């Protein structure tokens, strides 16, 4: 099979799987899809593809010298996407915290799916060169992830790059698993799934066992979702339709699992072998989201043309990761954000997270947290408070709301879970008191406090006056 057919299959498969899964993103239960539902009139915007289209523009400019520092500049100049780890990485970089710390510092979502979904561009730029694809996936993912979040993108890039050359899905899957360190949770999960598959239990049973052992309250958790992808690849038995439906029907981060499974199957089978019923509903065009601020390829054909032109000029000497590979140790730093807790001034080490277990003797049974903030803008912004705890919140000495459940927190302004979000109106330079009264629970919970743009969810960095 020619490389052009595989490259086209990769990104058409990515588009199909993302379009199939998008309407079910975040659904935690098992789905029962057999085809698109609803049936689309074309492709839809998806960050699974959007950021990769920016990366191809970055590679056109920087070539093999592209690294995390150069990618961070493209983030800050051209990407206005603030979901989960994207928003935290941009917040960090706007404060001068650059890679690799931008992916670790104050980041609840270090091991989410945001990097793993960007792997196709590196595999496709370096087909049959998995250690080079893995190198660029590492440079990419460290901007907004650490730990398993980095290994996840490297794993997918290595698998896909090797698959371009091998044409054997199981062979490339095994090769990519070997790359992972022995203490990686991803590696443990993948080996568990292979054992489940080889024991002949059903795909539905395998999905339930994955959830039991690796399930997360965060529907974008990368160990959980990559486990679904690997399960779908094994149980799909080289059938495009069966594989993407298995991935999406597992639930959780369905646009990402469907898109990645579709890309892998597209590489394996090529564009021509993808059933027409899937292709004709999304077509060749990309629909790029509003958060992308530069000119990008407008279709699969245009993207593949750009990739093939880069192939023609690729130098012989390319960077590679060395095996065995292990991420370097990374030490975070403390921001020292001031609060008054039960009458005592405390500087917490995070800009978002108040780690109350650092001071259990001060917080007592009913912690009262106060701070005073100001902003460099005028208008209405969002205040997000996320915690497993029960609390009452006052803003500028006025009650604005409370939380009466003990749901696990997901501190993201666009999808807050285990918390509340309120619009508050501010004037530039004016000071506002924020007061959070926590009710008695044990252990004393962490509290996440985020200010963000009302519409884009861009993190807004306050000034503190305690």
Model-derived segments and their meaning:
Residues 1-365, 385, 390-400, 436-466:
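Structured, active/binding-site neighborhoods that engage oxygen-rich ligands
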Residues 359-374, 417-422:
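Short beta-strands within extracellular/lumenal beta-sheet-rich domains
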Residues 397-444:
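Beta-strand-rich ligand-recognition modules
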Residues 374-382, 429-431:
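Extended extracellular/luminal ectodomain segments enriched in beta-structured repeat modules
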Residues 7, 368-370, 430-432:
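Secondary-structure boundary/capping motif
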